Structures are given as C-alpha cells and as structure tokens.
C-alpha cells in the first residue's frame, strides 16, 4: 500500500500543535500529588472540553453486542474450564466499559465483597476510578481482594482521567496533558526502553492507549496486573517469559493443559506492523482531528473504525480511494479468519485426543511434551485472534503467529496419535456435537441455565446497591 511518509509527517506536524505532554508522576511534586485527588466523573470536564466530551459520550452509539461464542463455538472447547467459555462478546464503545464487565458471565454473581471468582485486577482497564483508587490506596491496596470489592467504587466509565492529567494547568488550558494513570503500565514501558516522560509525542499518544490495549497477567498473591514484556513483546518472547515462571491462567478441563489466555494485545501487534514502525499512532487512525460547527479543530473521542472518518485518517497518507483500501483490508481479514478456523479445528481435536489419552491411562511424563505443544499452539493462536484489528495493524505478523500455531498443533496431534496407538487406540477420536454455542457448552459440562439465573439475580439485587452507595459517597452524579 502506498504511503507518502513526508506528506504524512508534514500533515501531522500541521494538524497537531506541539503540546507539552508529561506524566502526572513527573509533573507533580510528591506533596501536591498527595493532595490532588483524581476526578473520575467524566461529566466534570464537559464545560472545559465540550467537543471532546460529547464525542466521547457518542461511544454509547456503539451499542451492538456481538456474541463471539455463538459465531464460533469452537472457542468454548478451547477455553473449557475458563470463564471465557461462558461468555465472550466482541468489544463495543468505551461508554459501556463498566456495564459490560458487570454484565459478563465471566465475573460471576458475587453476593458480598469477599465473594466471586475474579480479583480486583479485572476492573483495571474499565474506569478512571481505578486511577483514583490507586492514588488513594496505593497499588497493593487497590489490587487486594475480590472483584466485587470494587463494585461500589468503580462506577464511572473509561474516560478523561484514564489518559489525561486532568488536575494539571495544561489540561485546564485545553492541552492534552497525556499521562499514564496506571503505574504498572509506566513500569512496563520502562522495561522495553520507553520511559513515558522521555518519549516523543507520537510514542506517548500510543503509550496512553497501551495502558489497556495490551497483553497482561495477574501476578503474585495479590493478583496485580503485570505486562509480560521482560523478554520482549513478540509472541515468542512472552511465551518464553511465561514458561520461565511456570505461569498459567487456567488448566483446560478436557486436555488438562496448563493454558495461557491472551487478552487484547493491540499495542504489541501495532508495534510489529507497518503503521507502528512509521510512527502512525492509534490517535492518527482512531481519534483524528475534526472540526466542530464553528470550524475549530479538536480530537474526536468517538474512538472507532478509521473508515468512518476516511478523509481525516487514511486519506492523509494513502492515495487510494476508500473502496480500494476497504477491499485490501477485507482480503487481509478473510485470510486471517480462514487460517484462524483451521488452527481452531486442529486444537479442538487436540484437546479431545489428549482427554482420550488421559482416559486410556497416559502418564504425566508421557503427556508433558504434548501438553506443551498444545499450550504453545493455543497461545500463539490466541495472541493473534485476541488482537482486535490485527488484519490492519499487523496482518503479516498475524498470519505468521497463526502459521506457527498450526505447526505446534500438528506436532501435538502427531505425538498424540503415537501415544494413543501404544494404548491400543488407533481409530479417530470422535468429537461431540459442538455446532452451536449451547451444544459446545453442554459438551464441557456447563449448566448455563443456572449460571444465567445467578447473573440476573446479581444484576437485579447487588448492582443497584453498588450504585446507591456510590451516589451517597459522591462518586456518581445524582
């Protein structure tokens, strides 16, 4: 695809004034940082930044829910034994961040602050209240306890104070005042040689998004968020890191494989692609400068598909028309989807074949190399498919990861065939009917009627109590 670098650089230098951007941790003295509380209520900043606020609020228009498990029931098998096998929707607007984490079946139906399956860390990318709590309680205090503990505290959707130092003079004067509001993200950027306060403005713009649009895991007894970047950001680097510390997110209930669950590694995959390598940032494509009714330029906070603002995004660098670029992107998306399905088919068979091997009396020693292949295959598949927009951000890297996943899955199945033969099993291991989400969930033993009923009761009884308490404490507008 054609890209006129000089033209793009000139455009960006004209369209984005040189803002003085700094981290809140670097800008404020320790004394002042203790006295200025993070303001999490997004509407507080509407009078100062009306265009940005209204465009952010418009993310509520991105309301459609797409059920990824219904679209592709194979996922239920790959995530058997993990909450993602219950519920996995494709992402929607930032205005639904808190609603969606409350309503997903993955967070369970806790009755008390000490109840439920997940830790506090599961709030970490959902709200500016997280930055407020980290400031008030420290990281150890924030991460302590179960997810339900944060219910009455984390109530405002992902917004202003997640990305901006809203207490700064720069922000009051209409400047972006970008900041990393999550200390663990700041440490991760330093680990890859990108300290935020020394980064250029192009890097900072993407680093802010990279606080959340990344792979991460829950570390230690406190289940604190950490990015696995100590060895690098490529899929093999992170795999090596996880293997070295013997980390797993869960054990697949069919194959008994210690698994890794990739999250949403857009920062890593963007960095590996042509846009990241040429300093085309998340902001350039997903939050372009647009004009308001008075002709004033502002950053559009209705984060979405670049094709929705083609003239302000793609057309600044590319000479092709919109239809031509859409065709290229669609072809890349289809290529990745086709290989994704092929890998999933192999992994589904591998999990059931591993179960058959266990049932036939296989030993831990016999299964260890096989499970390692399954772990590595699914990790590489997952990092590719969990990265939203990889067909645009880094299609070559996506295909490379999926190709590697296919090879690892084939290795696992070859070893399984040999092992099963030693147990007297030479026929193909039959699969149950997993043609729908419901049938796949039944095949792994999920009682979805009970799970859904418990969730509905939680939403009707517990969540209203959280919101009432938040209003009484002044955390939500009345």
Swiss-Prot record:
Recorded coiled-coil stretches: none
Signal peptide per UniProt: 1-26
Catalytic activity: 6 Fe(III)-[cytochrome c] + NH4(+) + 2 H2O = 6 Fe(II)-[cytochrome c] + nitrite + 8 H(+)
Compartment(s): Periplasm
Binding site for substrate: 216, 264
Binding positions (heme c 2): 160, 163-164, 301
Cofactor: Ca(2+); heme c
Enzyme class: oxidoreductase
Annotated residues for binding of Ca(2+): 215-216, 261, 263
Gene Ontology MF annotations: calcium ion binding; heme binding; iron ion binding; nitrite reductase (cytochrome, ammonia-forming) activity
One biological process term in Gene Ontology: nitrate assimilation
Keyword Calcium listed: yes
This protein's pathway: Nitrogen metabolism; nitrate reduction (assimilation)
Binding site for heme c 3: 94, 209, 212-213
Cofactor binding note of this UniProt entry: Binds 1 Ca(2+) ion per monomer.
Pfam families documented for this protein: Cytochrom_C552
InterPro entries found in the cross-reference section: Cyt_c552, Cyt_c_NO2Rdtase_formate-dep, Multihaem_cyt_sf
Annotated positions binding heme c 4: 282, 285-286, 393
Swiss-Prot/TrEMBL keywords: Calcium, Electron transport, Heme, Iron, Metal-binding, Oxidoreductase, Periplasm, Signal, Transport
Binding site for heme: 122, 125-126
Binding residues for heme c 5: 275, 314, 317-318
NCBIfam families (alphabetical): cyto_c552_HCOOH (TIGR03152), PRK11125.1 (NF008339)
Family: Belongs to the cytochrome c-552 family.
Role according to the record: Catalyzes the reduction of nitrite to ammonia, consuming six electrons in the process.
HAMAP family: Cytochrom_C552
Protein name stated in the entry: Cytochrome c-552
Organism: Salmonella dublin (strain CT_02021853)
Gene coding for it: nrfA
């Amino acid at each position: 695809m054609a890209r006129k670098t000089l033209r793009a650089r000139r455009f960006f230098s004209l369209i984005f004034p040189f803002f003085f951007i700094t981290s809140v941790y670097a800008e404020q003295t320790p004394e002042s940082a203790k006295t200025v509380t993070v303001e999490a209520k997004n509407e507080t900043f509407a009078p100062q930044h009306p265009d940005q606020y209204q465009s952010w609020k418009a993310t509520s228009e991105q309301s459609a829910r797409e059920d990824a498990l219904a679209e592709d029931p194979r996922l239920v098998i790959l995530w058997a034994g993990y909450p993602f096998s219950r519920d996995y929707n494709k992402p929607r607007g930032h205005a639904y961040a808190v609603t969606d984490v409350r309503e997903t079946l993955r967070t369970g139906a806790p009755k008390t602050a000490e109840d439920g399956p997940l830790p506090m860390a599961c709030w970490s990318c959902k709200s500016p209240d997280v930055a407020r709590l980290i400031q008030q309680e420290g990281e150890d205090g924030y991460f302590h306890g179960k997810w339900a503990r944060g219910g009455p505290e984390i109530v405002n959707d992902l917004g202003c104070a997640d990305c901006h130092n809203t207490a700064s003079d720069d922000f009051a004067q209409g400047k972006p005042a970008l900041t990393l509001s999550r200390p663990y993200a700041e440490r991760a950027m330093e680990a890859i040689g990108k300290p935020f306060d020394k980064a250029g403005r192009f890097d900072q713009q993407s680093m802010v998004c990279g606080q959340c649009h990344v792979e991460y895991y829950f570390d230690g007894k406190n289940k604190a968020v950490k990015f696995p970047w100590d060895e690098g950001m490529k899929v093999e680097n992170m795999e090596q890191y996880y293997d070295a510390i013997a980390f797993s997110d869960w054990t697949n209930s069919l194959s008994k494989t210690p698994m890794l669950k990739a999250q949403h590694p857009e920062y890593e995959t963007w960095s590996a692609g042509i846009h990241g390598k040429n300093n085309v940032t998340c902001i350039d494509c997903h939050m372009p400068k647009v004009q308001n009714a008075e002709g004033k330029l502002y950053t559009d906070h209705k984060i979405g598909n670049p094709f929705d603002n083609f003239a302000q995004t793609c057309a600044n660098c590319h000479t092709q028309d919109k239809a031509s670029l859409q065709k290229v992107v669609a072809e890349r998306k289809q290529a990745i989807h086709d290989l994704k399905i092929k890998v999933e088919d192999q992994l589904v068979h591998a999990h059931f074949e591993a179960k058959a091997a266990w049932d036939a009396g296989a030993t831990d020693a016999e299964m260890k190399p096989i499970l390692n292949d399954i772990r590595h295959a699914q990790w590489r598949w997952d990092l590719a498919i969990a990265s939203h927009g990889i067909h645009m951000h880094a299609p070559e890297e996506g295909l490379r990861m999926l190709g590697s996943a296919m090879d690892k899955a084939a290795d696992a199945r070859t070893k399984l065939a040999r092992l099963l033969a030693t147990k007297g099993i030479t026929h193909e291991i039959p699969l149950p009917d997993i043609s729908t989400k419901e049938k796949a969930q039944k095949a792994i033993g999920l009682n979805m009627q009970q799970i859904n009923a418990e969730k509905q009761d939680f939403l009707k009884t517990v969540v209203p109590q959280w919101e009432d308490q938040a209003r009484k404490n002044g955390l939500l507008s009345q």
